[in-house]
Amino acid sequence: MPSQLKGRKVAFLATDGVEQVELTAPWNALKQAGADVVLVSDKRGEIQAMNRDAKGERVHVDVEVSTVTARDFDALVLPGGVANPDKLRTNKDAVKFVREFMELDKPVAAICHGPWLLVEADALRGRTITSWPSLETDVRNAGGAWVDKQVQVDQKLLTSRKPDDLPAFCVKLVELLADAIDERRLDKMVEQSFPASDPLPGPIALR
């Protein structure tokens, strides 16, 4: 449904060297579902996307990562491309941005080499993910478990291995965000029905 994610704001964190299709495919899927998508980067202007080893399009950056926090968004997407996350993992603001999403238990989706940022943010302890196969040792050294699957979901963390996985990745990404919205709505309904200041139901209200 076009309005499935209406009002949700999703950050895409990327820089030069991002694999173009890993940026555009989930970007378009989320837009079609009604989400607002924002390209966050380590610099202003434009970034250079890649089609494997060839230059792709130049993509406009919406906001610098140093000027925003995870609280400004509902979810985060980490596309791959080797140079992209390898550069971002050396940027303290980018790493902090990723860590904040994980600490706030917000949906995070990463594909291919994107999970390198999760490794750098020390956000994989006790988590099970997939990625480009060469990241397996990095994931395990960071305290995570690695599996070879098209799509892996661990709570609100979604990961996939490569561009060929994008169709399944995009479907699951929209589902993950929709489920998170439903969960928040339920929490809000409970809070409205049973405010924290209300006495407990039953014959005795504890003080």
Regions found by a protein language model. Name each.
Residues 112:
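Catalytic nucleophile serine of serine hydrolases
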Residues 132:
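Active-site-adjacent substrate-recognition loops and nearby beta-strands
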Residues 1-104, 108, 116-128, 136-181:
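Extended, subdomain-level signal for the structured scaffold at the beginning of enzyme domains
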Residues 181-207:
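Intrinsic, low-complexity terminal and presequence regions
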